[in-house]
Amino acid sequence: MIDSATFFKRKHCILLAVAVLAGCSTTAPRTVSEAPTPVTLPAATYAKAAWSALPPVSDSDLQAGFVAWRSSCTRLKNDAVWAKPCATAAAVSDKDPAAIRQFLQRDLDVYALRAGGHQADGLITGYYEPIYAGSLTRTDKATVPVYGTPDDLVVVQLESLYPELKGKRLRGRVEGKVLKPYDDAGTIAAKGANAPVLAWLTDPMDLQLLQIQGSGRVRLADGKQVRLAYAEQNGHPYRAIGRWLVDQGQLKKEDVTMDAIRAWARANPARVPELLRSNPSYVFFVRNPDSPEGPRGSLNVPLTAGYSVAVDRSVVPLGSLLWLSTTRPDGTPVVRPVAAQDTGGAIAGEVRADLYWGSGDAAGKLAGDMKQKGNIWMLWPKGVPLPN
């Protein structure tokens, strides 16, 4: 009898062979690659709950969360799960909290998310759209390249042959007739990539944090800004640089924030390359037109500050409406509906979300300090089977 780990590895091997023979042509997805996770979740991951079990929200948060979620319908209008609720929601006034509540309670059921089938508390973090100084050409100060998708990067969608592996992808490059792992971040930093350079930054830490956030802007010398969004990833697992600092005895676990990591980097410039090599994952970007809207997440709709979240799509399908209960770093309650519109390499697990806080330094401070406990409920269309 084959155990699940061996079976999963064999599937990878079979698919690699098929992919190479087929030429490995595919369209680059927007989702962030994650290390393999179990594809079958316990049924108790989704625990049916009553509407009365949800913590109350203000009318303003209800309206803002509804509007953020409804923007997902531009991508979901033909989706088997969400087409009907989206069609109904189009006629609901976002100025009428009572009408929004009526729609939600009539069309959607409530399911509490449970880690391991029983644990209600999970981790809620934050992210934002950073703005960094840079240039469109290399200069004496701007020497750190931001790469677009490499020409030789191959992406294999596992679900094309194995539906139960939905959302899982392999990435690499073809050498001869063999698909090999793509270069890790350290190799790319040392040797470069076979990819266009979209912009140049002044600090390698800026690039690392840009990759962690998944999108950002480059502020040019003339004041104009270039918007960058996640395009692809090199296929290597994400390793938190904060964890490396803890393992090295440089920071205490409870002290790890973006500000603390940057302060360490400024105090230890000679060790910054070592720090960056500890995370083999490398994100490639695409230039997007500048816009007052938020950056586009994995669902390819603009993110809404405070009301869009990144999730583990193997648990929560993109486009889902969630009810979030957590706190800000200062303890202020955050209770609101949020839209699952993005993914992230570090976002894995049943009760796990990354809340988008907006653009710039203030949003960055809030996002960087946020490591809160929280509870999540999924609002799922009535009569529709739960995700597998």
Spans of model-derived segments:
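Secretory/export targeting leaders with adjacent low-complexity proregions
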Residues: 45-289
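Residue-level signal for mature regions of secreted extracellular proteins and peptides
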Residues: 17-18, 79
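Bacterial N-terminal signal peptides that target proteins for export
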Residues: 2-14
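Short, low-complexity, disordered segments immediately C-terminal to signal peptides
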Residues: 28-39
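C-terminal soluble interaction/assembly domains
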Residues: 25-28, 47, 58-60, 64, ...
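C-terminal motif of bacterial Sec signal peptides marking the signal peptidase cleavage site
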Residues: 20-23
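Short, functionally important structural connectors and interaction interfaces within domains
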Residues: 13-16, 46-49, 120, 277, ...
